[in-house]
């Protein structure tokens, strides 16, 4: 299950198991796979092309995954970039919508403001 604000910017094969819980503002690029196994994934996940998330794991908020990486263990900290096979923390990184530019950041903040006003 995905939260709101899912972005799939390119056409291509994307496989996601149905027992996973994935937060808001997730971005999935072409040729990515998030296998089944009840993963718990926070908000603002960014999965680059060719990456795989496998095993029963947990990922924190604002996790970016580099191209062709294999994530097979939990990373509970947020604001990180994972790369490699198996993946490891490459560096600290803000949420993708902050890193990618002002228009993305403004859109996310506008949605959150609207959501708060409706509650």
Language-model segments: residues:
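N-terminal alpha-helical segment
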Residues: 7-8, 27, 46, 64
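Left-handed beta-helix
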Residues: 1-25, 31-40, 51
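Glycine-rich hexapeptide-repeat left-handed beta-helix
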Residues: 37-119
């Amino acid at each position: 299950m995905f939260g709101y604000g899912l972005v799939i910017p390119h056409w291509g094969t994307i496989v996601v198991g149905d027992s996973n819980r994935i937060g808001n503002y997730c971005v999935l690029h072409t040729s990515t796979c998030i296998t089944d196994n009840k993963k718990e994934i926070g908000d603002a996940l960014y999965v680059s092309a060719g990456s795989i998330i496998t095993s029963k794991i947990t990922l924190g908020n604002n996790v970016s995954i580099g191209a062709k990486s294999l994530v097979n263990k939990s990373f509970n900290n947020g604001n990180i970039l994972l790369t490699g096979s198996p993946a490891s923390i490459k560096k600290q990184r803000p949420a993708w919508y902050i890193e990618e530019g002002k228009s993305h950041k403004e859109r996310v903040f506008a949605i959150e403001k609207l959501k708060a006003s409706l509650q």
